[in-house]
Amino acid sequence: MKLLTANFLNCSNKKCTSSPEAFPLDVVDAKLAIQQLELKPEFLIGIMPRIDWNALLKTTRQLGNYSLPDEKPDLVDDSDEVLLKSLHNVLLETEITEGKMVCGNCGHVYPIFEGIPNMLLSESEI
């Protein structure tokens, strides 16, 4: 699962939909892989408005990556090549292959196996 995907996932439990603690999910016991991909500045510029920067920072720091700036950058063109490469590496090349995502509100654990998060809840948790 790419970190870009993790930036859009939250707890599926109805009790958690209105809780700010349910997003982002905490990433624990993660195994990471880096997959080299072609840099596409236009994609990064287009996706940046949809990125929850604070959630992304929390996730990357839980994974030991401190390469992103504290403040969300204004990415309006491809002139900042260093920033583009850093975002590309974090959002698109870094993958969580194994691990868990944990809801900070209800504590539900979503396992990640072979890069795929299991976001299903049992009937009693819905």
From Swiss-Prot:
Pfam family, one: Trm112p
GO molecular function: protein heterodimerization activity; tRNA methyltransferase activator activity
Record-linked Gene3D superfamilies: 2.20.25.10
Locations listed in the record: Cytoplasm; Nucleus
GO cellular component: cytoplasm; cytosol; eRF1 methyltransferase complex; nucleus; tRNA (m2G10) methyltransferase complex
One of the protein's GO biological processes: maturation of LSU-rRNA
Predominant subcellular localization, coarse grouping: cytoplasm
UniProt domain TRM112: residue ranges: 2-122
Family under the similarity heading: Belongs to the TRM112 family.
Record text on subunit structure and interactions: Heterodimer of mtq2-trm112, forming the eRF1 methyltransferase. Trm112 is necessary for the solubility and activity of the catalytic subunit mtq2. Interacts with trm11; required for full tRNA methyltransferase activity. Interacts with bud23; required for full rRNA methyltransferase activity. Interacts with rcm1, nop2, trm9 and lys9.
Protein's job: Acts as an activator of both rRNA/tRNA and protein methyltransferases. Together with methyltransferase mtq2, required for the methylation of eRF1 on 'Gln-182'. Together with methyltransferase trm11, required for the formation of 2-methylguanosine at position 10 (m2G10) in tRNA. Together with methyltransferase bud23, required for the formation of a 7-methylguanine in 18S rRNA. Involved in biogenesis of both 40S and 60S ribosomal subunits.
The protein's name: Multifunctional methyltransferase subunit trm112
